[in-house]
């Protein structure tokens, strides 16, 4: 379980032994106006549910990536063709090279990576101690 500074709560789970999963790195945001779902196994899609839909016509809709989204058009000129894992690696490499040459900022930077590591350590310690643990408590630990 997680609790954010703004009061939002959530849950995180991880498993390397979940049967039937290949690369189910995913997140789901459930909010007052709807739900948004991303799954790495289908990374060219977002699933969106909007709470204000008419009864009987409600349900998730699938938003597909296309040329209007980021670097997609550099690989595919039209929607529906989808980019793959290798294209993502090319995009990541280009962004890294641009950062090395000072054309863009690198993300995450070392400070952000440190903050992410504190969150992971807080989660590990919280699980080990069966208590709430804040990333702020992980300073210099």
Predicted segment positions?
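Conserved loop-to-helix N-cap of the C-terminal "lid" that shapes the substrate pocket in Rossmann-like
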Residues: 107-113
């Amino acid at each position: 379980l997680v609790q954010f500074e703004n009061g939002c709560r959530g849950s995180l789970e991880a498993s390397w032994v979940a049967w039937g999963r290949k690369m189910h790195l995913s997140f789901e945001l459930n909010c007052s106006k709807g739900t948004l779902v991303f799954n790495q196994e289908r990374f060219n899609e977002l699933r969106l549910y909007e709470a204000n839909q008419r009864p009987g016509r409600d349900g998730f809709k699938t938003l597909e990536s296309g040329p209007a989204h980021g670097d997609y058009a550099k690989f595919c000129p039209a929607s529906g063709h989808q980019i793959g894992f290798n294209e993502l690696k090319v995009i990541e490499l280009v962004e890294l090279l641009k950062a090395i040459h000072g054309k863009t900022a690198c993300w995450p930077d070392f400070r952000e990576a440190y903050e992410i590591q504190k969150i992971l350590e807080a989660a590990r310690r919280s699980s080990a101690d069966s208590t709430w643990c804040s990333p702020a408590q992980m300073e210099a630990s």
